[in-house]
Amino acid sequence: MRTILVADDDDIFRELVIEILSTSGYKVLVARDGQEAWELLQGNPADMAVLDLNMPRMDGMELTRHIRSDERFREMPILMLTIRAMVEDQLSGYERGADDYLTKPFDQHMLLARLRVLERRILG
């Protein structure tokens, strides 16, 4: 069973993502902001991460930078899941190390398909 870190400060979206992933067979680690996610990763390694961009204390871009700079997590697939749909935001996400980018609102089948692609491509 793969473990996915979900970091989102929006209760509704966070709970929706948790429900989708849990019922699809994933173990889910949950954080309400980037700082909490980073602290959670220290003792609970995840196979993949689904990160919001706009979060208090540490946003998704900064969290991605931390993940990519840490040798333990450098290869962990990261999917940005955010309301920020501008091309500039997407490009910035990819430049900072995101492997994929999906905007809210989203289709649950598309979220799962993209995670499976990351799982196959990066995790084998």
Regions found by a protein language model. Give the residues of each.
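Active-site beta3 strand of CheY-like receiver
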Residues: 45-50
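Receiver (REC) domain active-site loop signature in two-component systems and cognate sites
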Residues: 55
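Charged docking surfaces used in two-component/phosphorelay signaling
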Residues: 15-23
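Short hydrophobic/Thr-rich beta-strand motif most characteristic of the beta2 strand and flanking loop
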Residues: 25-32, 40
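C-terminal output helix
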Residues: 106-116
